[in-house]
């Protein structure tokens, strides 16, 4: 057991990326209801503040990070469509 810990420590010293290896996060699939509400909020305001993001996440049973990224991606999609 002790040898395994020493080996792991030495491996992390030599190859730092070995300590950060992790399973990639699965892509979020939004429900129709979640998308509807997110689009409604986006139509009102393209930017959502911290408090509103927290509230939206709670209502939709999502992480704040997921709501934040959804708004970022939606703004990018809107700009891309406007440039066509």
From Swiss-Prot:
CDD domains: homeodomain
Keyword terms: Developmental protein, DNA-binding, Homeobox, Nucleus
DNA-binding residues (ranges): 23-82
Signal peptide: none
Pfam family for this entry, one: Homeodomain
Family matches, as SMART domains: HOX (SM00389)
Gene Ontology biological process terms in this record: cell differentiation; regulation of transcription by RNA polymerase II
GO MF, any single term: DNA-binding transcription factor activity, RNA polymerase II-specific
InterPro entries associated with the record: HD, Homeobox_CS, Homeobox_NK-like, Homeodomain-like_sf
One cellular-component annotation, GO: nucleus
Superkingdom as given in the UniProt entry: Eukaryota
Subcellular location: Nucleus
Official protein name in the record: Homeobox protein ceh-7
